[in-house]
Curated annotation (Swiss-Prot):
Annotated active site: 119
Pfam families for this protein: DNA_gyraseA_C (PF03989), DNA_topoisoIV (PF00521)
Subcellular location: Cell membrane
Name recorded for this polypeptide: DNA topoisomerase 4 subunit A
Any one GO molecular function term: DNA negative supercoiling activity
Membrane topology, from the record: Peripheral membrane protein
Site (Interaction with DNA): 39, 75, 77, 88, 94
Family statement drawn from the similarity comment of this UniProt entry: Belongs to the type II topoisomerase GyrA/ParC subunit family. ParC type 2 subfamily.
Protein's job: Topoisomerase IV is essential for chromosome segregation. It relaxes supercoiled DNA. Performs the decatenation events required during the replication of a circular DNA molecule.
GO annotation, biological process: chromosome segregation; DNA topological change
Annotated organism of origin: Staphylococcus epidermidis (strain ATCC 35984 / DSM 28319 / BCRC 17069 / CCUG 31568 / BM 3577 / RP62A)
Cellular component terms per the entry's GO annotation: chromosome; cytoplasm; DNA topoisomerase type II (double strand cut, ATP-hydrolyzing) complex; extrinsic component of plasma membrane
Site (Transition state stabilizer): 118
Amino acid sequence: MSEIIQDLSLEDVIGDRFGRYSKYIIQERALPDVRDGLKPVQRRILFAMYSSGNTYDKNFRKSAKTVGDVIGQYHPHGDSSVYDAMVRLSQDWKLRHVLIEMHGNNGSIDNDPPAAMRYTEAKLSQLSEELLRDINKETVSFIPNYDDTTLEPMVLPARFPNLLINGSTGISSGYATDIPPHNLAEVIQGTLKYIDQPDITINQLMKYIKGPDFPTGGIIQGIEGIKKAYETGKGKVVVRSRVDEEPLRSGRKQLIVTEIPYEVNKSSLVKRIDELRADKKVDGIVEVRDETDRTGLRIAIELKKDANSESIKNYLYKNSDLQISYNFNMVAISEGRPKLMGLREIIESYLNHQIEVVTNRTRYDLEQAEKRMHIVEGLMKALSILDEVIALIRNSKNKKDAKDNLVAEYDFTEAQAEAIVMLQLYRLTNTDIEALKKEHEELEALIKELRNILDNHEALLAVIKDELNEIKKKFKVDRLSTIEAEISEIKIDKEVMVPSEEVILSLTQHGYIKRTSTRSFNASGVTEIGLKDGDRLLKHESVNTQDTVLVFTNKGRYLFIPVHKLADIRWKELGQHISQIVPIDEDEEVVNVYNEKDFKNEAFYIMATKNGMIKKSSASQFKTTRFNKPLINMKVKDKDELINVVRLESDQLITVLTHKGMSLTYSTNELSDTGLRAAGVKSINLKDEDYVVMTEDVNDSDSIIMVTQRGAMKRIDFNVLQEAKRAQRGITLLKELKKKPHRIVAGAVVKENHTKYIVFSQHHEEYGNIDDVHLSEQYTNGSFIIDTDDFGEVESMILE
């Protein structure tokens, strides 16, 4: 035979083959049929068990036998895939109503593997037989199996809407399905209402089918998500564990979880909660125990004595599978194609299937009844001429001759003649004659009823309704899942996530930051802080791990850093550079740092630039959830930079000090609260080539200390300052010299807690007591404290 060779491109061949493969996967493996809610392997398992008599009213049989039957006759795939599907049909935490009963280890909600199929035994559940009922009455179409040795059903009769009741999940090429299980009684009631009112709306249907009913129970939140899913096939709800509070003898409390979301692995959930406890991501949990036994699921979360149980519960909802989002994606095979279907479409498809099934069954029953009627009429006729019939049979040569004689002599049909010659003598009693008459009457009534069903659509629907009601009455169970209309907002107190602890925060001039335990700080002392050469401590203060640090830079940006996210480093060790926490520019410098507890509206920040701009922004504006990048707090122009930030609880005086010795004092109530991206307004009217060196808050108990580039230090009393209006030039605080004039390089407001100063020159650090610096008059240049000829010009100063 000559070969046929086709010249095809690889792209076409691959595309064609993958298309065929995808079609097979979609239709024959991963997606359920909308009519019976089963995937092919599930259908084959149930049919194989039914065909072999492995039904609910019989003894259990080895699972391996069923797997062998399925593989040998219907499903030529690996035994593990068949056994896995069989096991799932028996798991009451996966299916709302199991379709297979299994003895032995059939896995667990912890995702433990089942015992090998040679150890477990199984049989059909009572409900699954309602899927297969009347399958032998030509109710559904059969097709040849994979090797044409037998037939298998394309779909099961399915006397109840299994797709909705048990749901389905699967992934195929380009398609996925997630249909949740529902309550049997609700689904059947909704179907009955649809039969009575085909134009019923989703809102009306949801009075009966309220929403999913998961086998693991739980609380379903989001009625709008359910409605959207029922309308479109896609929707989203929140599924939350059922958690109750239980007192302990010790005075402590524990949270008891008795129901978890559908498809959640219990052991993984327990492990996750315990990891959150061990990693100190949540404060207040003492112990997590899995106390599940044969009486039911139970997870105990023991809490500390004063723990906020509600906040801990909310934290676990958000950070573990104690609460999940369930996404409806109701895709099923309808008329041979995958289709996204809403609730009405699914019910309509099921009802159309039932109409076809009941019609086929009725035709079959009618045909059988008419055949039996024909036989009964023949027997009755024979009994009416019994003597003649007996004589004819006795005179016949054999069975065939007797049948032929009956047909020829008395006009019996072939079927009637067969029944007559097979009639046993004891059936000729008067009792059996009466029984035939009674059977004839019953058959007449049955045939009339069956013909009425076929001729009358309303009668056919009535049959479907009666059968659905029968199943509802027989298998009705209470709802397990509770439905709540709204999705609860999860509010988590910071105290739950972060243990409250007082620590020492430190920040250096070069941007090294750390938090240190009070024990390490007290053991070392301030002066023993770990620093790089040339670096110095900018600020240190006691803060709480539940606080937030705002680090301000010279580029008008700030870093939002929760204290608990800072590395816990010993006082004597070098801190972590700020750029390792939040990336900043190489030329970006830290100008100040503040600790925020609650970002309350009354507090505000004053931000001042070198070129004399100033702004005021409420503390609440600085709160954010973004920690990974610097955020803008002031729009700073080119060749300008932020020099200081001051946090105030209420309006008060601020003093501005310039390089050329000018000072302006005014109230912050002259500044309006502006957004973080604003550039601000003019603070002081600067002279040419002058710039701001200090902007700080001041009150009548303070003094001002300043140092010039020539090494002179001057301290003035608050009374020297004169309150004025913003944007003025201010007063002069230095005596102007024609030769080598003094220029202020640093200034600070002396508060009650300040006792020492440190002045930094190019080659020297000068330490001194503030009390040793006497108050000066307005128009003086102060006293020299550093010989700049020896140590270079002064650059900066800090107070401690």
